[in-house]
Structure formats: structure tokens, C-alpha cells
């Protein structure tokens, strides 16, 4: 078997084959489920690439990913509003948005690197781009291959394309290392965009009122968390590699853009504080241990203002991008679900690969639509038909928070220590309120998308193990 390098390897193969067929200076990249919704989209992109003032600087023009199947209640945050409506416009004011894997028009020469220069030695180019004579000609001539101009037969063109697409063509070359899409991460788009902007290239974000491209967004929990795990793995892989934005150099990228890249590579590490907030205050509440200032304490207002300001900022961003209060709840819920599961598993996966414990893997998002699952999504009901790996932590933490909330109220009534424990009681209440659909899936719902009884039992056992472990640890202490 040969390493195929996942999507990066496939895109590099297409890049080589297209070089001897069309050799177009600009390349449109779309995922298999995306289609053009605005015929002027290419013209919009080319206007930036051919602008007489800035034409030499943009490596790619990025369009937002938009989806035709987003329900009014976007319970899975499938529209990825925070990225395409808040972050990317902000990045456009710096060196430009990140490369997002689809819906972009990129310069071919940007992917070839600095090796292709006027008067370059063809033999030297073969060290970087491989042994294909026709492909080397395409680098130097900036025109279609002679095989298309009638000098050779169609069969020869087909043989050349097969040669360029062969599994071993990229061996002993710079493909995936310095040429084309980089192989070092399953988030090949993010990494390649970072490498391009580090070399001084810029990017442009175009988001017009009419969607330029449309595709299929995720409509069930399994696809959401599988996709999130893959993205988390890729981002952490970049963050712990030689391409870490905080340390990579020399770089021609502006400082703020580097910090934005670095922030994205750290995003999966939200799993750590989220797991702490979902367990430590609750366990201490069960044991009657206060962690935060009481309501009567003057420092209480600091914690209150931190929480309110964080929610207010998030809500303000949502309102200014056309969202609603429902969008705030859905995004908070998805953020919690992903942090507890996808971000944790993705981070662990990246570190295990780094340590050589396991090989790289690429879990593609399912693009096929299931009518039953789509109906649940359109009705605003979560489809909990996913693996135990994803469900068990979510259900176990909900059970733990239910127990701590009940104990907290009992202490408030019987002992009267709500003043001391108010913040911890509120944290449990907030987690349960945001994640009410999980409780609904455990107790109320009877359809196929409910949480299976076996998962509830397993999660209850997991919760009890956590409680007993903490209890034994406290006794030993």
C-alpha cells in the first residue's frame, strides 16, 4: 500500500493532471456536495486576481460556505455563523481569511512555490515536481500541453495523466512538503493557507448577498461530532508541529494574523476548561465545598460581570449578523457538546499521532441525506443515533449536573448555604438548561432519535465511578 495523504494528496494529483490538460492559471476548488449558485462568482474572484494594483498579492479568493438545507432552527450550528459572518470578515481586514477547503479560487503559481522562475533549469525542476516532461513544460510555458495541440494522440495524453496520478509519483519530490497542498495535517487547507500567507501571499474574502456556492450542511449529531473531531485533530496537529503559528518563521505575515492562526490551533483545547467547569464545581457542591465567593461577598460581582459580558458579547455578534436568541442557545449548546467530545478526542488523536501511538486517519463527513434524520432536524429535534464514544460523556455529565443541582437545592433548603454555593448551583442549572434536549432524549422522547437505555445505564455507571473515585481520593487525603 502507498500513503495517499488524504484530501491533500487527492488535490495535488488533480493539480498535476490539470497542469498538462488545461494549465489554467486559476483553480476553483469545491467539495463534492457544493455547486455554483451564482454564475458571476468566478468573475468576482478573477477581478481580485487581475486587479492592476493588488493582483500580485492575493493567493486565493475565499467565498463563504453556505448550505441549501439549513433549517430555520439551526440546532447543529450547521451554518458555521461564527466563522463566515464574524471571524472571516475580521481577518479580511488583516492579511485575509484562512483557506477553508472549498469555495475558493486560487492561483496555480501560488501552489507551485518559488521554484518556478524565468529561465529555470528543467532538470532542477524535476527534483521538486517529479519526472514528467510534459508537466515541466507546463510550468515553463504557462500554456496547454503539446499533447492537446494535436501533436500527439489522445492515448498519450491519457498515459501522461495516469503517470501523474500514480501512487508513487510524488516520491522523492517536494509535493506535499513545499509544493501543492501540504501533507502534515488532516486540516490541509488551514495549513496550506498558513504556509502561503507566511510567504507573503494575501487572501480576499467575498461574501455577497446572493450565495455564490451552496452545499449540504450536517443534519445529525453523529456527522457534527465526527466532523468536529477531524477538524480538531487537524488544528492541533498544526499547533504541535513545526508550523506552530506562534513559533514558525521567518514569516511575512502580520503579527495579528499570526495570533489569529495561533488562536485557531488552540481552539480544541477548550475541552480542558469545559471538562473542569462541568465536573469540579459539581463534585465540590456534592461535598459541600464552596469554590467561589458567596453572593454577599464583594468579589461575587466580578464573576457575575465576567459571565454576563461573555454572553452579551456573543449575543451582540449574533444579532449583528442576523441571528436571534435561539441562535445563541444553539451555538452555546453545540460549543459545549463539541468541547466535551470532539475537541477532546481530536486533541488526544493528534498527540497520539505525534507520539507514534497510532497512524493518521481521515473521517469524511457523510454527504448523503437520510429522510428520517432530515425530518427530525427540520422539526428541531436532535438525532442521538451516534456512537457510545460521543454519547456517554454527554449523558454522564448531564446526570452529574442533575445530581449536584438537586443536592444544591437540598442544601439551600435544609442548611441554608445557598449564599456560599450559589455560583456552583447556577453553573449546574445553566449547563442543564442549555443541554435540556439531552434530558429530553433520555426521559421524554420515544422516537428512534432518542438516547438508548443502554447508553443511559452505561453513563450512570460512568458517573458513579467518577463519584466513587473522588470520594476515595478525598478519604485518602
Where do the model's predicted regions map?
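Internal catalytic domains of large membrane-associated glycosyltransferases
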Residues: 1-261
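Basic/Trp-rich segment in TM-proximal cytosolic loops or flexible interdomain/linker regions
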Residues: 164, 220-224, 230-426, 438-459
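Long, low-complexity, polyampholytic intrinsically disordered regions
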Residues: 432, 446, 464-466
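Final/C-terminal transmembrane alpha-helix of multipass membrane proteins
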Residues: 454-472
